[in-house]
Amino acid sequence: MNKTAIKNYAVWARNELIERVTRKAYEYGVEKENIVADECAEIVNGRLLNDDEKKQRKELIKVINEKGFDQVIEEVAYTWFNRFIALRFMEVNNYMPQKVRVFTNSENEFKPQLLDEAITLDLEGVDKEKVYELIDTNQRDELYKMLLLAICNDMGNYLPGMFTTISDYTMLLFPDNLLKEDSVLGKLISDIDEDTWQDQVQAIGWMYQYYISEKHDQVVNILKGKVKKEDIPAATQLWTTDWVVRYMVDNSLGRYWIERNPESPLKEKLAYLATSKNNDLPIVNERVNPKDITFLEIKTRYLIQFNVA
């Protein structure tokens, strides 16, 4: 895995997405220091808004008034980065339930199969007449936007935690010109080898780590004092490498089981289990059924119960 390439891309992508999302906000008359026209305006910067855009713009202004411009732009930029990375990971590993590559073709060229199969795709929210119209008028960017948004919404049926239905201001701020070679998607394909994504979740973890690295360095600077509430994720949510996770699990849940089942063959598989010099562990005279174990994962606050046949 080329972590240098991942870092260079992720740091660049964050700044690029923030700039693109900021431009989209500007198109709808929303700037950091100024909001052009009131929240119910029908025409903004010479643009006639449809009903969805008016609703989304009104919500955007409301959220900005609550959270602040920079925070909202940062959140939207990360939302799109997160989804793009997840989709790339899934298409490379053939995990897409729609059985279509969203960014590349079968040769891993930046020629989305999604566009080639636009006519035959059966996705909720895709108007076939609109598809034909966009194809006939060669509006590839607009067609790609419609299809990509539909894919993201459809993915909500499979991964609702990551792909919540997009109908709010997040859609309004969807970045433009994604089919260009120097776009966030174009460079995602050209700068990160396809093999990188076959290293399972490691690639996603390092992408996140480097994406927030600049923000992390800013907010944890002790000279700036206390970390703000909205900056806590960037300051604390760092990628935990595979060996650290294995060490934690081996010496918590794994140790708990081996102490109560000293003859268990599982011990040979716990590569990071810490034992005494004699390779011994204390024996606890307590029989336990795996189904009865409830494990608290403190970092995510999940209670995990095991269902073992």
Summary of predicted features, one role per range:
Residues 1-309:
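Preference for the N-terminal adenyl/adenosyl cofactor-binding alpha/beta module
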